[in-house]
Amino acid sequence: MSRLFGTDGVRGLANADLTPELALSVASAAARVLYERDDSRRRVALVGRDPRASGEMLEAAVTAGLTSAGADVLRVGVLPTPAVAHLVSAMRADLGVMISASHNPMPDNGIKLFAAGGHKLPDAVEDEIADRLDERVDRPTGAAVGRARDVPDAGSRYVDHLLEATPQPLDGLRVVVDCANGAAAAVAPSAYRLAGAEVIALNAEPDGLNINEGVGSTHLDGLRAAVREHRADLGLAHDGDADRCLAVDATGSVVDGDQIMAILAVAMKEAGELADDTLVTTVMSNLGLHLAMREHGVKLRTTAVGDRYVLAELREGGFSLGGEQSGHVVLPDHATTGDGLLTALRLMGRVVETGRSLAELAATMTRLPQVLVNVRVADKATACGAPEVAKAVAEAEAELGDEGRVLLRPSGTEQLVRVMVEARSEGTAQRVAGRLAELVAAIR
């Protein structure tokens, strides 16, 4: 049986897979689990959401579940996921609930839980919550029923935190920001203006239906055109819940998460802020990042794909920078999860501090051509473990040498094997990936 909680919480088609009944049950079970760990005081939960239409329905259900279990609720409204994580810590809440499906299409939604301090809940606690969804319990009555109230200044509290974490004024910088008609629209343009930048905001009018609709960090063409049209210094793109940030330089070229991490790692190393001179990233990061960091004396720690694995490595090793190629960047000295706005402010600050363009800074690393082929198979474990596949991978690695890389990994949700090849030339990467994909597909 699959887990209710995936790598990023509970997700599904809102009102079909993720129903109000399920949302209420998850929230109520979460509150009960917290109480049983310490029933000495009344619990407080903080609830936020992105602007998609189903968020209001699910927010009401989550609030009902929490209060019915005796927890008080602080409703912060539409805010980014990292804002909710920060406010859980800043307002000393016992639990955080973010209602969002991040970069997914509008009809989807999700529930992500944060522990006290703003960190993601451990798998074991999520599993305990899932196991107790249907249990019959005596509910509190009278004064023991939880109360709910709004927090009108939640957004400004988060913006103040961002500005404290990024002291470099951005005066003279012109930036275009694509808010994806999502949670970033509530705070990103104002935060960047307060930091001193001239801001042109795109897709900052969410109506509940237009979130991620051909815009944001997964659709960069509009941002690239706007940067050139407005002669901006750079562009920034967020996803629906603003835990990601990708960038575009003045020419319209994309600067991905690997390049952003390279820029920040070099800056932090120079300032003595890069703990153990180490950057944490995933196996999908481009080989160009590895080569560039080696040149700058930065060590890399590599994890499985997923920001939860990056976060775990950062916490375990006490490191100060990590992230993913997709634009999830984590700065643990200032945030407990990926924060697209904090990343953007730090990136813009580096541009102003150095007086160099984003294109010049991004040249810190050279992206090697990367080819990814998804191969449908009968059994992904059999395909990945086949001796002939292992032999072919070893031969490909020997052929590429230090100037390329091969990675085969099974999909976490489908019967697919992902074949990734990097090489100095696009043609070589395509040829090697095609050869391996053909072999993997033939495994029975």
Swiss-Prot record:
Keywords: Isomerase, Magnesium, Metal-binding, Phosphoprotein
Post-translational modification: Activated by phosphorylation.
A GO term from the CC aspect: cytosol
Family matches, as SUPFAM superfamilies: Phosphoglucomutase, C-terminal domain (SSF55957), Phosphoglucomutase, first 3 domains (SSF53738)
Active site, per annotation: 102
Keyword Magnesium attributed: yes
Matches recorded under Pfam families: PGM_PMM_I, PGM_PMM_II, PGM_PMM_III, PGM_PMM_IV
E.C. no: 5.4.2.10
Biological-process GO terms, alphabetical: carbohydrate metabolic process; peptidoglycan biosynthetic process; UDP-N-acetylglucosamine biosynthetic process
Cofactor binding mode and count: Binds 1 Mg(2+) ion per subunit.
Disulfides per UniProt: none
Superkingdom of source: Bacteria
Top class in the EC scheme: isomerase
Cofactor list: Mg(2+)
Binding-site list for Mg(2+): 102, 239, 241, 243
Keyword Metal-binding appears in the UniProt entry: yes
Reaction catalyzed: alpha-D-glucosamine 1-phosphate = D-glucosamine 6-phosphate
Any one Gene Ontology molecular-function term assigned to this protein's record: magnesium ion binding
Family: Belongs to the phosphohexose mutase family.
Function: Catalyzes the conversion of glucosamine-6-phosphate to glucosamine-1-phosphate.
Protein name according to UniProt: Phosphoglucosamine mutase
